[in-house]
Amino acid sequence: MSAAEVIKLVVIGDGAVGKTCLLISYANNRFPEDYIPTVFDNYVVNLTAGDRNIELGLWDTAGQEEYDKLRPLSYANANVFLICFSITNPVSFENVYTKWYPEVMHFCPEVPQILVGTKLDTRDDRGVLDKLQQTGHKPITTEQGNDLARRIKAIKYMECSAKTSQNLKQVFDEAIKSVLFIKKKKSKCIVM
């Protein structure tokens, strides 16, 4: 058996958009019920893609502003980024373009990115829709996600739910493909 190829996947986005749930649900096949803000955490998943053994390192990051100086330390040697926002949090969607995309481009301009709309299960939730309506907002549409992905030159836009696992595996499969099957460049992250 050949040695495993190591892929470092870093998940970024605003606090409370579901980054940790995304990773735990994928890595452990269970949805964590309690919200615990992340400072930094990582997980490893061993899998195969075709005839290749993969060691997928999943790096969780803190989205809160107070970690802006610390967070980029986790970007070193990243192979792919998942830039996440909550489908039912328009501010987190706007922050992809104003905060997260510029941050990735500053530190790791050559590393592929996938834009991920999280909490897909809440898009049609009556309680969530009522709260959004009270503030004059609506859930982010698939079309809006695709448009933003084009603007930030992400490889793809995907939507998923960590709670129901809808499209969850596909997000990570796409991330792995982006590293293995797109012309592989040496990770060029500049972290000082």
From Swiss-Prot:
Residues 190-192 form a propeptide. InterPro entries: P-loop_NTPase, Small_GTP-bd, Small_GTPase, Small_GTPase_Rho. CDD domains: Rho. Pfam families: Ras. One of its GO terms (molecular function) is protein kinase binding. This is Rho-related protein racC. One of its GO terms (biological process) is cortical cytoskeleton organization. It is a lipid-anchor. A motif (Effector region) lies at residues 35-43. The modification Cysteine methyl ester is found at residue 189. GO terms for cellular component: cell leading edge; cell projection; cytoplasmic vesicle; cytoskeleton; cytosol; plasma membrane. Interacts with pakB. Belongs to the small GTPase superfamily. Rho family. Keywords: Cell membrane, GTP-binding, Lipoprotein, Membrane, Methylation, Nucleotide-binding, Prenylation. GTP binds at residues 13-20, 60-64, 118-121. A lipid is attached at residue 189 (S-geranylgeranyl cysteine). It is found in: Cell membrane.
